[in-house]
A protein has these predicted regions:
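Conserved pre-catalytic core of RNA-dependent polymerases
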Residues: 142, 170-380, 388
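Amphipathic alpha-helical blocks
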Residues: 2-32, 90-94, 142, 151-153, ...
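Short amphipathic alpha-helical heptad-repeat segments
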Residues: 41-49
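Basic/polar low-complexity segments
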Residues: 14-33, 59-176
Length: 400
């Protein structure tokens, strides 16, 4: 599918075709979900409840009503058990620091499932800002941080990197339909996607059929060094870094990106790690498979105990440093230079450059959307590739 079309055009054809067929064979039905619902209540349960109540209003406790009531009860109990069983498994397998959040989720009461950005910042309240104006203010704040840096530009890169980009030291790999199918099945499907994303159940059921056009698009991306424009739009939900946010500084932007962009990121991360995996500082515990904050704490305690046993050590001073908005303050030109110096080939550098260039963001706040904002710097939080690129940027920060 797509032939010699650019990735953006090929992606547009693919998404339009899929959405047209989806609307034709699976038309949308509106189901209202309340913040007072239990966390295991699904759209199907709400739909059955509505049918049951409608039948009761028309004909009382008819045979059809009893059948619908039975279906509703069975579905409700099944989803409740599934929800609790899943969270029990998660509790048994989770890291120690995550246990509280899992337990809190298991004991969710009506009203606990309210959207995470229902807070109102005191400054916005005192200025009498509408939800739309607040969304715009938050978007301007986050965009302003990223705009501290110049956009990614080949002319701003060192000469050695420019020469590398003009050369072709190796050819990009070619993936097949089976490779794409495995990544589609493995990729995490968020409960709330971005506009245009396919429903999770459709992706799950039709993964084999979707794999063919997806692998064609990914091969087109690696061959052309272009990233689809549609996949560079971030739908950002601000969440509080503290229980009660006071200012925009207390907010963390969590990005949602198109599902098939995430699938492509899985491949890019895999290819990057083939070149730089062994060069990542062994003291980097966050975002690295097999490492966790628990490993860091053990290493830190070990460092303290070893130095306490030393005869020439009388005191140990530990200084904890936190860089403000570090994820939003990434210089893309510096990042590409570091990747090049770590041995990443030109074709893969071009793919990463395409991923980072011309990104845009829109804030979702209390059901309102801000206008699109340009992001010449920073990295999308909540994305697989964005996390690895941040690790690369700070890789040489540690020293003995």
């Amino acid at each position: 599918m797509g032939g010699d079309l650019p990735p953006s055009h090929q992606t547009e054809v693919f998404e339009n075709l899929i959405n047209d067929k989806l609307n034709q064979f699976c038309p949308e039905k509106t189901v209202r979900i309340s913040s007072q619902d239990k966390p295991w209540v699904t759209a199907e349960i709400k739909y059955l409840d509505r049918l049951k109540n409608r039948e009761y209003t028309k004909k009382g406790k008819s045979l059809k009503y009893k059948q619908l009531a039975k279906q509703f009860k069975e579905k409700y109990e099944m989803e409740a058990k599934k929800y609790l069983r899943k969270n029990m498994d998660e509790l048994m397998d989770c890291k120690p620091g995550q246990a509280y959040s899992v337990l809190k989720k298991m004991g969710a009461q009506p009203g606990d499932c309210i959207d995470s950005n229902t807070f109102t910042l005191p400054g916005h309240e005192s200025e009498n800002l509408s939800d739309q104006e607040s969304a715009e203010r938050i978007a301007d704040y986050f965009a302003q941080i990223s705009q501290e840096f110049p956009p990614l530009d080949r002319k701003l890169l060192p000469l050695r990197v420019q020469q590398k980009l003009d050369s072709q030291s190796s050819l990009p790999p070619i993936i097949d339909s089976h490779d794409a199918y495995q990544k589609i099945k493995a990729a995490k499907k968020p409960k709330s996607g971005v506009p245009g994303d396919l429903p999770r159940v459709i992706v799950q059921e039709f993964a084999p059929e979707l794999a063919a056009p997806v692998y064609s698009i990914i091969n087109n991306i690696t061959q052309s060094g272009e990233w689809p424009t549609q996949w560079k739009q971030e739908w950002v939900t601000p969440i509080g870094k503290v229980p009660i946010p006071e200012t925009e500084d207390d907010l963390r932007p969590i990005s949602l990106t198109p599902f098939f962009s995430k699938v492509t990121e899985h491949f890019v991360v895999m290819w990057l790690l083939e070149y730089i995996g062994e060069l990542i500082d062994f003291r980097q515990y966050g975002g690295i498979k097999g490492n966790s904050i628990t490993h860091y704490l053990i290493e830190f305690l070990n460092f303290i105990l070893i130095n306490q046993d030393s005869t020439d050590q009388t005191a140990i001073l530990a200084c904890m440093v936190d860089f403000k908005k570090a994820f939003n303050r990434q210089n893309h030109n510096l990042l590409i230079t570091k990747l090049s110096d770590m041995g990443v080939p030109s074709w893969l550098l071009k793919v990463v450059m395409a991923f980072l260039s011309d990104r845009k963001m829109v804030i979702r706040y209390k059901g309102k959307l801000s206008s699109m904002k340009n992001l010449p710097g920073g990295g999308p939080q909540g994305t697989l590739l964005g996390l690895l690129l941040f690790i690369v940027l700070i890789n040489d920060a540690g020293f003995e």
